[in-house]
Amino acid sequence: MSGSKCCSSSNTIKVSIYLFLHTLTYGLLNYHLNPRLLASTGVVESDIPYWMSYLSIIMHVGQSLLLQKFNLGYGWLLLTKYPVYVLLSTYYLTPLSQIAWAFIIDAISLLVARCFSRANPIKCSNQVNTQYSVSFLFTIMASVLISVLNYISQKIFLNGLILGNSHNVVTSLVAPPLPLQYLAHVPIGYVIQRVVFSERPIPQSLFLMIFLTLWNCFIPYSILFSMNWSAMFQVVGAYLSQIWIITFICWALSL
């Protein structure tokens, strides 16, 4: 009994060290190295509130605790955080170099925390073992579906809401060609099919998905895009609805 308590106490200490190091590294790198991801969208650095960096760190801590609480895998970070980068690169033409900085910062903060704490508190949930061919098939199917739906919604959004003309075709300069979107959405497609084949109930997975996506995308960026909050809400809402549709399609096909 005492051995079990000792093991539990040791694991708690490791998790605490991990979360502390991860948050500290993430905060320092974002504060000093991140070249203002949203600068290219027309947001002037002087217009960004000084507390925005601290809000980002606090939200990151909350997300880490939630991932640990529900025993979610790192793949959920892809599913719930990186769609906003796809949206920014699509609608606001954010340079890929700035998006790459965000990937690098996340990767370094995770590596530092794991190396120095020797802990991996966020473990992948128990999942049903599937054949690689089936996993690959569902990944490709999900990435293609989300790319097509995203491309269609871009045209409708840009034509109907921004340009005010639903009959003219929007130039491909604004919306990336579909082959590039296929590649960008492969990681998202992979995570979606893992969600479908996990032992976690689909309704719970979808609830966590929408909550974490709004947590990462809508809350901080609605502050910066307060003058165009309705547009940002519709963009994020469209992306969420696509993920829901694709999840249900994959789930139905897996029955």
From Swiss-Prot:
Spans traversing the lipid bilayer: 13-33, 48-68, 72-94, 99-116, 132-152, 172-192, 205-225, 235-255
Keyword line: Cell cycle, Cell division, Chromosome partition, Endoplasmic reticulum, Meiosis, Membrane, Nucleus, Transmembrane, Transmembrane helix
4Fe-4S keyword on record: no
Gene Ontology biological process: cell division; meiotic telomere clustering
GO terms of molecular function: telomere-nuclear envelope anchor activity
One Gene Ontology term, aspect cellular component: nuclear membrane complex Bqt3-Bqt4
UniProt subcellular location: Endoplasmic reticulum membrane; Nucleus inner membrane
Membrane topology: Multi-pass membrane protein
Biological role: Connects telomeres to the nuclear envelop (NE) during both vegetative growth and meiosis. This connection ensures clustering of telomeres to the spindle pole body (SPB) when cells enter meiotic prophase.
Protein name: Bouquet formation protein 3
